[in-house]
Every structure is written in structure tokens, then in C-alpha cells.
Amino acid sequence: MSFDVRRFDIYRKVPKDLTQPTYTGAFISICCCVFMLFLFLSELTGFIATEIVNELYVDDPDKDSGGKIDVSLNISLPNLHCDLVGLDIQDEMGRHEVGHIENSMKVPLNNGHGCRFEGEFSINKVPGNFHVSTHSATAQPQSPDMTHIIHKLAFGAKLQVQHVQGAFNALGGADRLQSNALASHDYILKIVPTVYEELGGKQRFSYQYTVANKEYVAYSHTGRIIPAIWFRYDLSPITVKYTERRRPFYRFITTICAIIGGTFTVAGIIDSCIFTASEAWKKIQIGKMS
């Protein structure tokens, strides 16, 4: 007696002439196919799309930077001449630089009565400050007007990624034109290291920051202190990491199989219930007629 492998077939075939098509079954089949197509396209879209997961940890992500952070500053002072505007930098490592001019540019505004300062410079990864003032001017003005608009203040590499909302330029658009002309402005910054990791594993380093500010007119025993625009910064020990991820292929296949199998099973149960109820109703009607 030869062994017949067909005995293991769990998908036994029923001759077509023994099946009975119904309008209800056709309707359920069409709805079933449309439903499966909709779910398949939804899962395919989710599989192709990249999701961004964020996490927090304590570490310095950019150890190769040499302990430096690049800063980009763009600020307009519409009532202060460019000859008077300067940038000073100092920190807890002993750095004290007055009138920083490297990689900076001054653009006259309002027919020379105002100035837009654009500069790129580096700061050490220690608490410190940089400030826009008239300290580097040859002759100090009597009443410098420090009203201003901050167009940009950003730290680290430029990071513009869709679906990532962050405070990379938190002071961009800050308008202090209606402030007291003789007031100093203190911006207290907490810089947060940020890492963005792409699907291929490439990492980009940047910095977000939170800000609090105050405005005041300062005095000493000798009289009023020359106003300035201060940016006092400190670094957060917490790093924010954004990681691009895509759903694994095996999960996509598992979900598709579940959609197809589950839909066919539920549709078969519904069709069977409707058909059984219909046949029972027909028998009841025949019994009443007889």
C-alpha cells in the first residue's frame, strides 16, 4: 500500500457544483475585499513611513567637539550706531574677550543710525555669558539705546527635520523695541544637548535651549551702569536623542496575515450565520404554508 501525501492536505477542495452562491455571500465577499484592501494600504503606509522616537539620558553626546559649542547670533539694534556695537564673551574657564570680531558682520540700518549684528563664534562647555554692548567702543555714548530684535540665536549644527518640534531657536523673533531704551536685558539660557540619529545610523549634534528673561536699569554708587544685552548660559546634563525607526518587516508580514486571516474568518462566520438563519426562516415559512 503506497503512502499518499495528500492525506496531510488540510485545505480539501469541494467540487464547484456542490457549492451554492448567494447574493448575501457575494455582498459580504465584496465588503470583505474592500475592508482588507483598506487595512492593507493603511499598514503599508505605516511600514513605509519613518517614526521618530525620543529618549533622555545623561551623557555628553558630542565628545569630539573639543569642548566647544558653535553659536550663531543675528540681532538688530535700530537705534545704535554700528561703531558702538560689539560682542563680549566670558566664561568660568577664564575667557574674557571684548569686541569679538572674527566671523562677524555689522550691517547699518536706518541710514546708519541702527545696526544689525551677525556673528558666528564658539563658546566653551562651561557656564558663562556673551553680551552685546558698547564696551568695546572707543568713546562710550551717554545714553545707548539697547532696544532690539533677535532674529536668530542657535547653538550647534543646524537641525531642521520634519516632525521634530524643538526649541532650537527659542529667541528667534523676540521683539524688545518697546522696552526702556536705557534698560539692560538678561536672557538666562539652559542649553540642552540634542542628538538626531538617522535610519542609517548617522548622527547629527545640535542644541536646544530654554530661556527666561528680565529687563532692568542698573545703578551703582557712581551712577547708572551702561546697559547691555546679556545671554547667560549653562549646560543641562540631560541629553535629548531623536532616533528614526521603521517597523520591522516581519511585523508587517505578521499584521498582513492577521488581517487576511481574521477578515476571512469573521466574514465566513457572518455569512454562515446569515445563511443558517435564512434557511431556518424558509423552513418555518414552508411549515406555515403546509
Swiss-Prot record:
Pfam families: COPIIcoated_ERV, ERGIC_N. It is found in: Endoplasmic reticulum membrane; Endoplasmic reticulum-Golgi intermediate compartment membrane; Golgi apparatus membrane. The gene is ergic1. Possible role in transport between endoplasmic reticulum and Golgi. Residues 1-27, 276-290 are cytoplasmic. This is Endoplasmic reticulum-Golgi intermediate compartment protein 1. It comes from Danio rerio. GO terms for biological process: endoplasmic reticulum to Golgi vesicle-mediated transport; retrograde vesicle-mediated transport, Golgi to endoplasmic reticulum. PANTHER family: ENDOPLASMIC RETICULUM-GOLGI INTERMEDIATE COMPARTMENT PROTEIN, ENDOPLASMIC RETICULUM-GOLGI INTERMEDIATE COMPARTMENT PROTEIN 1. Belongs to the ERGIC family. The chain crosses the membrane at residues 28-48, 255-275.
